[in-house]
Amino acid sequence: MERTFIMLKPDAVKNKHIGDILQRIEKEGFKILGMKFLKLSLEDAKQFYAVHAARPFYNDLCTYMASGPIVACALERDNAVAHWRDVIGATDPKEAKAGTIRALFAESKEANAVHGSDSVANALQEIAFFFKGYELN
């Protein structure tokens, strides 16, 4: 079994898509190991997205991610990282395949409903950012 980290972004929470996305998580065969509803501080967002610090969108991304509540989840299933990336679709919802989470729920390339780890190594780091080991089932 493989683990991945996902986050429902402020737009998905604001637009009341939490239930729909959680249903999709279960339908896709993921086990939810841990889940938290919280609001990131700007400092936390900057630390979480530090890998993008040199990119031109970094400050706007961090400000956006600190703008409202998020839902952080640690998930598990076979091929979890790649499968979740397929389920969420392209970063830009205009390019996302029909039926993917971003095609269904994203507002824009920036407010694109969900985050998903892009590798197993990053998934483990991202899970550790939000969860202590004893918090995971």
UniProtKB/Swiss-Prot annotation:
GO terms for molecular function: ATP binding; metal ion binding; nucleoside diphosphate kinase activity. Signal peptide: none annotated. It is found in: Cytoplasm. It catalyses: a 2'-deoxyribonucleoside 5'-diphosphate + ATP = a 2'-deoxyribonucleoside 5'-triphosphate + ADP; a ribonucleoside 5'-diphosphate + ATP = a ribonucleoside 5'-triphosphate + ADP. Its main location: cytoplasm. Its EC number is 2.7.4.6. Its cofactor is Mg(2+). Keywords: ATP-binding, Cytoplasm, Kinase, Magnesium, Metal-binding, Nucleotide metabolism, Nucleotide-binding, Phosphoprotein, Transferase. It holds the Pfam family NDK. SUPFAM superfamilies: Nucleoside diphosphate kinase, NDK (SSF54919). Homotetramer. Major role in the synthesis of nucleoside triphosphates other than ATP. The ATP gamma phosphate is transferred to the NDP beta phosphate via a ping-pong mechanism, using a phosphorylated active-site intermediate. HAMAP family: NDP_kinase (MF_00451). Belongs to the NDK family. This is Nucleoside diphosphate kinase.
